[in-house]
């Protein structure tokens, strides 16, 4: 199972939020410094999110994200604020390995098919951010229907993988909620990466045993509740 340290960027800083609330932001320095840190500790993947883009304009922090992509040689997936085909193509053409489409894919599902045909499904990930069983969009401020129905729709449209984020436990460092993860894995055949609540090596092991293809480490990694070494060992 793959492990993705998160590099979440807000106002030019690497941060971690609780439940997607920008008022809860804890700052952890520069995005590039953190990217280099996780790579030096063994990361071969990075999960980069433009939080300003998720809330406002998609161009904010773009240069910092490009720096991470250009100055590292690891697999970088990028999400946050991709609201148009132009945005999506821009990231895919600048060297990002995979993009995550969330609100945009929910508003205009056909873009999944368009981009998968153009760039290959393996580079197109659909974001399934769920709150109380419904997909959450627009910076997790709006609910837009059953998350399983949306996941299956994204798969049918050609998404190569899904990023499932449990908003209800995200950032709380209280462990994962197994039930919705299992429900999602049973409902689709494409790879699912899980974010939200991954706090201990036991969480990583549980996700591996369930059949998740990867997990994202955020708040627990930055606060020291889990080390990257522990997570990588549990994922083997």
From Swiss-Prot:
It catalyses: 1-(5-phospho-beta-D-ribosyl)-5-[(5-phospho-beta-D-ribosylamino)methylideneamino]imidazole-4-carboxamide = 5-[(5-phospho-1-deoxy-D-ribulos-1-ylimino)methylamino]-1-(5-phospho-beta-D-ribosyl)imidazole-4-carboxamide. One of its GO terms (molecular function) is 1-(5-phosphoribosyl)-5-[(5-phosphoribosylamino)methylideneamino]imidazole-4-carboxamide isomerase activity. It is an enzyme of class 5 (isomerase). Its main location: cytoplasm. The active site is at 8 (proton acceptor), 129 (proton donor). The keyword Protein biosynthesis does not apply. Its EC number is 5.3.1.16. The keyword Amino-acid biosynthesis applies. Keywords: Amino-acid biosynthesis, Cytoplasm, Histidine biosynthesis, Isomerase. The lineage of its organism: Archaea, Methanobacteriati, Methanobacteriota, Stenosarchaea group, Methanomicrobia. This is 1-(5-phosphoribosyl)-5-[(5-phosphoribosylamino)methylideneamino] imidazole-4-carboxamide isomerase. Belongs to the HisA/HisF family.
